[in-house]
């Protein structure tokens, strides 16, 4: 496996505009996300961004940066388009897509996303962690993954994703963490697929891959990162990252 890690980032955000450059102890949030990615030691780091000011911040933090026109439908498309510029000869066969609003993600959590790709039949790896309580289970902003880990297994096929508390009945439920490891061929295929019926219904783009017959497997971790989407989240990140 030859992985590269790419962070999609854009200034436009409904609840927290400009969040890639939001100040956390004198440095932009994107720099802190790059710190966590560097600590994970997965491979080279790059930022796929929509604006030059994000690119400047990424380069100042020691990463490559590619400005991608803001006409792409998703962060995944932004990552794939950036890879054409970063690696036109496809020397890297795995692309890790890390959201730019995870400044507190643990390095070991990030490294775990590669584990599903040890199975050559898996196209896309992702992460899940235990759902904490019924409030989280019934909150539609927390995406759930239907997967069944046998025994002490740390990886399981991801059978479905939903905003509802699936699966029904007694047993563990899993919160999906939006970090992905794509085989390069799977990433290139994914962006050519039209939006699928279940994707549009659930508003979850990973369902496009499942509906197209691609195999997604999830690695389980104990603790998921929180995404910075509001000013309250930003204050929490500042507290956790206080020097």
Task: Identify what each model region corresponds to.
Residues 42, 90-92, 119-123, 214:
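Short, high-confidence coil segments that cap the C-terminus of an alpha-helix
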Residues 171-243:
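Conserved alpha/beta core of the MobA/IspD/sugar-nucleotide pyrophosphorylase nucleotidyltransferase superfamily
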Residues 5, 45-47, 95, 125, ...:
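Hydrophobic/aromatic residues located in beta-strands of well-ordered beta-sheets
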Residues 105-196:
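Conserved core of the sugar-phosphate nucleotidyltransferase
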Residues 49-50, 105, 182, 229:
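A conserved hydrophobic position in a structured secondary element of the catalytic/binding core
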Residues 2-49:
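N-terminal glycine-rich phosphate-binding loop and ensuing alpha1 helix
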Residues 52-112:
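Short phosphate-binding loop-to-helix
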């Amino acid at each position: 496996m030859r992985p590269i890690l790419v962070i999609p980032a854009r200034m436009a955000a409904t609840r927290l505009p400009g969040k890639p450059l939001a100040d956390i102890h004198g440095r932009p949030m994107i720099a802190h996300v790059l710190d966590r990615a560097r600590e994970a030691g997965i491979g080279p780091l790059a930022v796929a961004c929509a604006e030059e000011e994000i690119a400047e911040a990424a380069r100042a933090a020691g990463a490559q940066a590619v400005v991608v026109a803001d006409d792409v439908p998703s962060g995944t498309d932004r990552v794939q388009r950036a890879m054409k510029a970063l690696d036109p000869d496809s020397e890297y066969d795995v692309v890790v897509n890390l959201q730019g609003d995870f400044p507190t993600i643990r390095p070991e959590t990030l490294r775990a996303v590669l584990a599903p790709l040890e199975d050559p039949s898996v196209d896309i790896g992702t992460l899940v962690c235990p759902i904490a309580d019924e409030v989280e289970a019934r909150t539609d902003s927390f995406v759930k993954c239907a997967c069944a880990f046998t025994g002490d297994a740390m990886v399981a096929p991801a059978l479905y994703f939903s905003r509802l508390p699936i699966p029904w009945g007694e047993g563990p439920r899993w919160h999906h963490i939006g970090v992905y490891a794509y085989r390069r061929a799977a990433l290139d295929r994914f962006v050519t697929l039209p939006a699928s019926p279940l994707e549009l219904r659930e508003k979850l783009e990973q369902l496009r891959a499942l509906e197209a017959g691609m195999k997604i497997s999830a690695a389980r971790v104990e603790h998921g990162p929180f995404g910075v989407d509001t000013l309250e989240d930003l204050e929490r990140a500042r507290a956790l990252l206080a020097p």
